[in-house]
């Protein structure tokens, strides 16, 4: 299988106005892609668009709330052909279940889970018609392992992982040449998880957005189906095979359920 060349490709990034979304947009432009920024914060998206153009790249921006199906479809029509879509927009509340409000829980599901459907459904037909494309979702390590204070966030990321696994199976069953890449990173230092901590920073470090963005774009070009970051995160799927008591002890040793004890975070779109 030949590598995907981002040079000349049209790359759509949701939540592209900040954080890792911004980084992926900027770096994709540096690789020669035309970058399409979607963000609910239109001014943030415009700033990234202007940043890319100032550096000599090609970009456009659209104000889009991915929970609004009609708005997503209109933005997809305005954006034109998309070769690579990166489902990056997301939110986190970081509260215990009984402290979470109904509105917060509902909004987390609408953005993190349902938004994947609306965006992917809007751009996938064009990819299939052209006989090529790449669907990428920035899920989370919390989509592989349930974490305290993330009952809503973790559940939506499990949904994202399942969505992408099913989409990949569907494309293969239908004989569609569409790449499907699921990215499951540990905490990324974007402000979204401000205050989150790790007990073993050498094994599970808080990741830097620039290197993560680079890894994601490399994985897209290599047509990889999955990307788990950091490398130690690759043991998480295997850990699920352990007996529950041993699994719980391992999680306790790694301090998994204490990572959110000092969480502050910020509301908004994830990069």
Name the predicted role of every residue range.
Residues 42, 63-74, 102:
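The beta1-alpha1 cofactor-binding region of Rossmann-like NAD(H)/NADP(H)-dependent oxidoreductases
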Residues 170-233:
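SDR active-site lid
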Residues 96-97, 101-106:
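Substrate-binding pocket helix/loop in short-chain dehydrogenase/reductase
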Residues 88-93:
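Conserved NAD(P)H cofactor-binding loop of Rossmann-fold oxidoreductase domains
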Residues 140:
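Residue(s) in the substrate-gating loop at a strand-loop-helix junction
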Residues 120, 156:
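Active-site helix of classical SDR
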Residues 10, 17-18, 41:
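Conserved glycine-rich cofactor-binding loop
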């Amino acid at each position: 299988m030949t590598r995907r060349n981002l040079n000349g490709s049209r790359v759509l990034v949701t939540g592209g106005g900040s954080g890792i979304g911004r980084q992926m947009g900027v770096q994709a432009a540096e690789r020669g892609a035309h970058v399409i920024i979607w963000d609910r914060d239109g001014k943030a998206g415009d700033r990234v668009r202007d940043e890319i153009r100032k550096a000599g790249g090609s970009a456009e921006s659209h104000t889009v709330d991915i929970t609004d199906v009609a708005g997503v479809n209109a933005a997809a029509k305005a954006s034109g052909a998309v070769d690579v879509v990166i489902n990056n927009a997301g939110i986190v509340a970081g509260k215990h279940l009984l402290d979470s409000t109904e509105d917060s829980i509902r909004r987390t599901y609408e953005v993190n889970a349902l938004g994947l459907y609306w965006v992917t459904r809007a751009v996938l037909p064009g990819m299939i018609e052209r006989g090529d494309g790449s669907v990428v979702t920035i899920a989370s390590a919390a989509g592989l392992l349930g974490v305290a204070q993330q009952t809503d966030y973790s559940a939506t990321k499990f949904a994202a992982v399942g969505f992408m696994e099913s989409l990949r199976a569907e494309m293969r069953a239908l004989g569609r040449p569409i790449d499907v890449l699921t990215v499951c990173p540990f905490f990324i230092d974007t402000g979204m998880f401000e205050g989150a901590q790790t007990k073993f920073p050498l094994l599970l470090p808080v990741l830097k957005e620039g290197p993560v963005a680079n890894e994601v774009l490399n994985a897209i070009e290599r047509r990889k189906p999955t990307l788990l970051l950091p490398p130690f995160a690759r043991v998480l799927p295997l850990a699920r095979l352990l007996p529950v008591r041993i699994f719980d002890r391992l999680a306790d040793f790694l301090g998994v359920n204490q990572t959110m004890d000092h969480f502050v975070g910020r509301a908004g779109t994830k990069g």
